[in-house]
């Protein structure tokens, strides 16, 4: 139901209950639920069952008295057509035609902002996601993070937050050294399997590409950095490192462009060392008495804050363990004014949560114990041509986001092994990401079609199907189908959707409306609450679930009630319902970064 209706009905029930309570008694919280069976009405409330024992009253009798209060109230008479008592004392309400009409009127009035709320008055939130090491192409796990993080950020924006999207680059440490050594070996003419090929080297074809461009003196640049030119010096490992990191950051920028994801800031791990923030964090923890020395290593007392054992911060060789810069990084988030932070990461990072939080607590900066929040996702398995794909020629050991977008786009060139995204970038094609809209839409929607904490199988063959089996096609087809109806109406009668705002909606919202029409209106009414719940629970998958349900309700209505009928009032009412459905489909798809095509 509409949030305004929910608030009114909650207050209505509370007021009815209040008249039955002894003076000075606190009113209980009113919880409204949707009955599991449509035959039981639109809203269910168990407040009579909650109060019966404290008041020493039969719950059905109490429910009937509450129902009488609702029926006698003018607000109830406007929004509620029937109040029924079920079972031991459940109060079931049926919404009135007026309430259903209000839903469609709200969609017409609010348009592209239907479902949005200003609940948080611009309160800042930082969402960190993807945060890949610049040691290779983005893999499908990063793709899941990108889909989850960007949709979550949009959800929070729709609830009135000012959202800051951040990518943290782990550009320091052993893995970056291994990258530089790998490129150096390629530049010297070695390849994987050769004697002299480094044991910890990266084996993908991209390493050879980096080496070739370095030796050719090419210039590369990440979106937020300075250009770096290949020095051609095979012995200069630092020059190789700088070139390789910048090269791969640029490659990841291209993947993110194709995926339609933009970040407000890229934060480099190396800057934490350069600015002295890592050392400052360690010094502060030592000064606070949160550390101790043992066997030549520095330990953090993480058990003081709920960890199962204390953790090493500085190893005996003097190097820091990987969670130490993470603690320093999160102090910068807090210091920049982000009192709410959400990290989207793979489930393999679960072990670092307690360590980072313990480090933050040890610094005594006033940071809450549950800071930051985490959304952890499980792995993605890719299926293609009926078999699991484990290796990418491009990456060497995993399927990349670029692979997935190109395959799901259905390009013959990609099937033949051509890197079509790279080809578009190098040719300078204008608006090149638009060419990959189909692939991007499929990857984004699919990666949101399961809860983050469940493993997901991405079936490329299914993503290419133009049938109801394909969830993104099913939802987008609903939007395109509605657009087609409006094209027909315009061609026949010159009809314009804008003229439907004042239509008589009795045929879809009144007592004679079909069950399919009523169900569709109810689904549209649920959109604002769904967005609010998804944002509160950090659950962007709920939007994809909702869109599939909305598309299903639309298709059921369309198959049951012919739209372009001779009766003008009925036709306009049904067209108004289609216009509202199209708007909500468009809004929901916008939240998750998927297009709403007019033709398919």
Curated annotation (Swiss-Prot):
Its main location: cytoplasm. This is Arginine--tRNA ligase. It is found in: Cytoplasm. InterPro entries: aa-tRNA-synth_I_CS, Arg-tRNA-ligase, Arg-tRNA-synth_N, Arg-tRNA-synth_N_sf, ArgRS_core, DALR_anticod-bd, Rossmann-like_a/b/a_fold, tRNAsynth_Ia_anticodon-bd. Its EC number is 6.1.1.19. The gene is argS. It comes from the Bacteria. A motif ('HIGH' region) lies at residues 132-142.
